[in-house]
Each structure stands twice: as C-alpha cells, then as structure tokens.
C-alpha cells in the first residue's frame, strides 16, 4: 500500500488545506493508499504524526526521510498544490529510489521541484546528509539541497506544472496537467476566477466555514 504524505508545520497554511488535499488524492488515486500528515496540529479524521525534525519552512520536508517515517512506497504533495487529474501514473515512481518534477524555473536554486515527490520508502539519504544549520544557511531551500545531493541521479515526474507559468494565462486546463503547483502569490484559495477556480472552490468554502478554533471543517471533511 502506498502512503501519501503532506507536511503542515507553522501557521502558513489553514488546516483546510490538509483536508482538501486528502480529498483530492482520494478522488484521483485509485490504488489503495493511506493519507498521513506530519504536523503538531489536531486534525480530526487525518492520520498525523509529530515532526521528526524541528526545522521550519521548506526544510521541514527533510523529516520525510527520517528513519521510521516513510517505511514503504510513498508519495508527497505540498499543501499548496491543486490536483487536476488522475494520479495513478505516479504509482510506478514509488518503486524507485527518488523521483520529482524538473524545476521549471531553473532560477539558480536547483533543478528539482519538490512540490511532488515519490520514493520507495526506507530511503534516508537526505535526512542523513543534511547538516543543520549549516546547509540551511548556505542553501536557498530543500530543492537546492536535493539537487546538490543527487545531481542528475533521479527520475523526472511529468504532469506537474506551475500555476504562474503554465495555468494563469491559459483559458483552459493544459491537456498534460495533472498537478498545479503554487509558489508565491496567489495561494490556491485566492484564485476565484477562471478555470482553476473550480478546483479551489471547495477549499475556499472550508476556510470560510471554519470556526475560530479551526476544526468545524472536520465534520464535513471526514467522508
């Protein structure tokens, strides 16, 4: 069975993002899977585990590769991706050591795009190789770290694009797109027009319906 992971640390993302991702994966991945979130938050209906590292921001993803975390075939999605198509094509990538999309920006921060990752589990090289805080101070982010660590020794995942580069100016969804990654602004829930808005409407509804304690969304998101 495949484990699908996300990471929710800090306060950047509303808890509704976890539920929206969980449901999008459920609707678009036909193989048996378990959805898990690395977080310290209470998220009713979501299987959670405490972060194995105390790193903040994108560095928290290093914890995915700690021993006893991902022990079998694994997929990972950033919370701010929007799933637009079937995900079954990603399953074979979980049988290899590591796979991710190529970085479409290539802005000098590495050629790996870590918004979607697949690996076989029990692969600890990033965790074992990361030197905190030295690496976090000299490198721009986890993508640059993975690029430095792996070079070209990884498989490229197709079907993942940038909302800014591949979606925002298009009048319809690109036929190749399965996952849209958001970076910078807007965040997915801030997209209220165009074809992308149909994929973000549920997320917006959950955010607007959430009570001050943040957990009314659980009653409508556990199905």
Where are these predicted regions, by residue range?
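N-terminal anchoring/stem segment of glycosyltransferases
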Residues: 1-57, 70, 184-187, 204
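Active-site phosphate/pyrophosphate- and oxyanion-stabilizing loops and adjacent acidic/basic residues
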Residues: 23, 63, 144
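Short, well-ordered coil/turn elements that cap or connect secondary structure elements
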Residues: 30-32, 43, 93-94, 151, ...
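Short, hydrophobic beta-strand segments that form beta-sheet elements in well-ordered domains
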Residues: 30-40, 74-77, 81, 97-100, ...
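Residues that flank catalytic or metal-binding motifs in active/ligand-binding sites
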Residues: 31, 61, 112-115, 142, ...
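Short, polar loop motifs at secondary-structure junctions
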Residues: 35-44, 83-88, 123, 143, ...
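GT-A fold catalytic core of metal-dependent nucleotide-sugar glycosyltransferases
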Residues: 43-52, 59-111, 118-122
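Catalytic core and acceptor-binding pocket of nucleotide-sugar-dependent glycosyltransferases
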Residues: 121-223
